[in-house]
């Protein structure tokens, strides 16, 4: 049980750290250029470049990722906000995983699928991040909806049960 408790905290911290770090990188010219081919070929996002310039699109993603990370980090005190942040993270990772289809993530020199290209290798990890975001969503949803007495709650939920 202690290992599970530690692992859950590590998953949440890791997700928050990644969202903060990758979000902060979106404010650099290098990252704005790096995501351009992904966004340009996406059926869900390509329209953004018709409205905004390269850096603005990247900055929008950065603000979104950092905000989601902050909301997820607030789970112990504001689980309702963590639900929203986790939902944004789930949508973010579903979108980035769609890049595997819209920008082929397979290496043609190695025969294509299942040989991952550099971009494909970078994106495939988002399956784990998606799973983590879904887990944080479920945990925050459960914490938000505690209707039973604090005695029935998990130890970390008891701590914050009277603050809601």
Model-derived features with residue positions:
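Membrane-interface extramembranous regions
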Residues: 1-164
């Amino acid at each position: 049980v202690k290992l599970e408790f530690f692992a859950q905290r590590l998953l949440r911290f890791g997700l928050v750290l990644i969202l903060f770090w990758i979000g902060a990188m979106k404010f650099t010219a290098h990252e704005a250029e790096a995501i351009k081919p992904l966004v340009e070929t996406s059926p869900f996002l390509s329209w953004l470049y018709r409205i905004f310039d390269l850096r603005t699109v990247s900055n929008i993603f950065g603000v979104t990722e950092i905000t989601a990370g902050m909301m997820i980090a607030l789970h112990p005190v504001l689980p309702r906000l963590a639900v929203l942040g986790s939902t944004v993270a789930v949508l973010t990772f579903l979108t980035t995983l769609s890049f595997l289809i819209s920008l082929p993530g397979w290496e043609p020199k190695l025969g294509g699928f299942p040989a991952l290209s550099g971009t494909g290798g970078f994106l495939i990890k988002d399956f784990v991040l998606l799973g983590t975001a879904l887990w944080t969503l479920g945990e925050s949803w459960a914490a938000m909806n505690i209707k039973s007495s604090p005695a029935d709650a998990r130890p970390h939920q008891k701590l914050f049960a009277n603050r809601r």
